[in-house]
Amino acid sequence: GMASKAGSIVGKIAKIALGAL
């Protein structure tokens, strides 16, 4: 539920951050 949602958001941010690098 919430943990899964938070993990998805973190993954999205991480992907964007890696893309910015």
UniProtKB/Swiss-Prot annotation:
GO cellular component, one term: extracellular region
Modified residues (Leucine amide): 21
Major location category of this protein: secreted
Places the protein is found: Secreted
Tissue expression notes: Expressed by the skin glands.
Keyword Secreted: yes
Keywords, in A-Z order: Amidation, Antibiotic, Antimicrobial, Cytolysis, Fungicide, Hemolysis, Secreted
Function: Has antimicrobial activity against Gram-negative bacterium E.coli ATCC 25922 (MIC=25 uM), Gram-positive bacterium S.auerus ATCC 25923 (MIC=50 uM) and against fungus C.albicans ATCC 90028 (MIC=25 uM). Has some hemolytic activity against human erythrocytes at high concentration.
Protein name according to UniProt: Peptide PGLa-B2
Source organism (scientific name): Xenopus borealis (Kenyan clawed frog)
